[in-house]
Design a protein with these regions (language model features):
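Contiguous, glycine/small-aliphatic-enriched amphipathic segments in soluble metabolic enzymes
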Residues: 1-88, 131-215, 219-225, 230-234, ...
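Beta-strand-turn-beta hairpins that frame and shape the catalytic cleft
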Residues: 20-24, 107-112
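Acidic/polar active-site rim loop that often engages polyanionic ligands
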Residues: 72-74, 112-120
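Glycine/threonine-rich beta-strand-loop-alpha-helix active-site module
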Residues: 80-102
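Active-site glycine-rich loop that binds ribose-phosphate moieties when present
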Residues: 91-94, 98-99, 121-143
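Short, flexible loop segments at boundaries between secondary-structure elements
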Residues: 95-110, 237-253
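Intrinsically disordered or low-complexity boundary/linker segments at protein termini
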Residues: 120-125, 250-254
Length: 283
């Protein structure tokens, strides 16, 4: 921003915004008398970030803005401020009164939908059931369509090694994942699986599939970041408004040094604009 020709316009309320190209509206949500030091986990930053998110949700719910593009937050700072949410997704769902949401991650190489998000691996396994899988497949279908894929080809990753190997390495594929895939097929969705997670993401990267349903957080996050962290975008599906964010964390180790790469944030803004246009064409 310092080296650009953009104009910084500080406002006290949204009615003062002019929403003009070349102008960055900065709404003061939290008045911090003493700014915390850069790069340190603390409750002040946690509370301020939470209040900013709540303010953004209210603006979106009141139709003052068409989309929210959030910055990374530090979950430990939230906890220190006694804010008991594991991440953005849960905050957004709670304060927009949305029951079912999903996390979709995209970059220039691949699209991934997570069937479980911010929880322990043991908890994620417990959450895998027929309803969870059907919901994830439907979210993947709608998410891919919102990004311009007319007839999405959906691949569902297995939970266990080798996608369970016919029950030798686990029953979740047989009990839940395969029945959900078959049910989705019956409704007309182009979906297949379960596929071994050590190969399916590369198959999708080659263009064999449009989107992959991953069964737990790191199963989906590792390939998306490996294949393009610099242009990765996190999209929350199911909300009454568009929400995107860059696909990286707070990077406290370089905070205040002026060396952060804005590419992922740029991609998140571009993606939000695309989703807004897609949403408008359906009205």
């Amino acid at each position: 921003i310092n080296n650009s020709k953009m104009i910084i316009h500080e406002i006290k309320n949204i009615d003062q915004a002019i929403f003009k190209f070349g102008v960055i509206e900065v709404l003061e949500v939290v008045n911090l008398k003493n700014l915390p030091d850069f790069g340190l986990i603390n409750s002040v930053s946690g509370k301020a970030s939470y209040q900013s998110i709540i303010s953004a949700i209210k603006l979106a719910m009141d139709n003052h803005v068409s989309a929210i593009v959030t910055s990374p937050i530090n979950k430990e700072s939230l906890s220190l401020a006694n804010i008991n949410f594991p991440g953005h997704t849960e905050i957004l769902a709670k304060h927009s009164n949305t029951k079912d949401v999903a996390m979709m991650l995209v970059n220039n190489e691949i699209k991934i939908l997570l069937s479980t998000i911010h929880c322990s691996l043991s908890k994620a396994i417990q959450l895998i059931n027929f309803d969870n899988q059907i919901s994830s497949i439907n979210f993947a279908y709608q998410g891919a369509k919102s990004l311009g894929v007319n007839n999405p080809r959906i691949a569902v990753a297995g939970l266990n090694p080798h996608a369970g190997e016919g029950g030798l390495f686990g029953q979740e594929e047989i009990d839940f994942i395969i029945p959900a895939i078959n049910s989705a097929k019956d409704s007309g969705i182009d979906v297949s699986g379960p596929w071994p997670s050590d190969t399916i993401f590369m198959q999708a990267r080659k263009g064999e599939f449009d989107i992959v349903v991953a069964q737990y957080h790191d199963q989906g996050l590792i390939p998306i970041k490996y294949m393009g962290l610099e242009n990765g975008v996190n999209i929350t599906l199911g909300l009454p408004f568009v929400r995107t964010s860059p696909d990286h964390g707070t990077a406290y180790n370089i905070a205040g040094k002026g060396i952060a790469d804005s590419s992922s944030f740029d991609a998140a803004i571009t993606c939000a604009n695309k989703l807004i246009k897609s949403k408008m064409t359906k009205i």
